[in-house]
């Protein structure tokens, strides 16, 4: 038959990489002698970004029916495998209807987004702040200059192999310092540098010609998503 839709799902035995914290639920299950894991999760790993989770082929006659069928099949599979729960993380608003129609409960979270309100330049952006905040921002930028740091943004594909090794070491240093596991490997970043092209952007900070800090970002047509960062020391 013809493919009309798909819903990638993960069978998970922990809650790492979701950015939705349900450890309390897992503990409640444990205290009552019930298994919380494995659970079924619809998400982009390590990416708390709202985007389609029910992938529907365009121009089909009944897309709502296809979406509902995907949700229903996931429920059937969860019952068949005796899973504790299904979690659809960060779906788009249009996907709430087929989920709530089957009893899914919405869980509301909070994120902080910066939006460009048509600023002409950086000074125009600064002018939107109070005098005190402008002073603080200018002070932070002055400290960067005084530290002798040079910032550059490059596509992931433009980085050399040695630069990617340095970027990955900086990425790992954040987890070493703050705790947690640096799950994403160097080959993973090198692979998406090729497959994503200009969509993968890396901000590099140089001191005396050497990379000392980095931020790994993903870019859509309208948005820059900061994902991972690391630094060799506290420069400011």
Where are these regions (language model features)?
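Internal alpha-solenoid helical repeat scaffolds
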Residues: 31-48, 61, 66
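Long, well-ordered early-domain segments
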Residues: 8, 43, 53-55, 63-77
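Conserved aromatic-histidine-acidic binding/catalytic patches
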Residues: 42, 58, 62, 66, ...
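A short, internal acetyl-CoA/4′-phosphopantetheine-binding micro-motif in the GNAT/acyltransferase core
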Residues: 49-63, 229-236
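A conserved beta-strand-loop-helix scaffold within acyl/acetyltransferase catalytic domains
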Residues: 1-36, 72-236
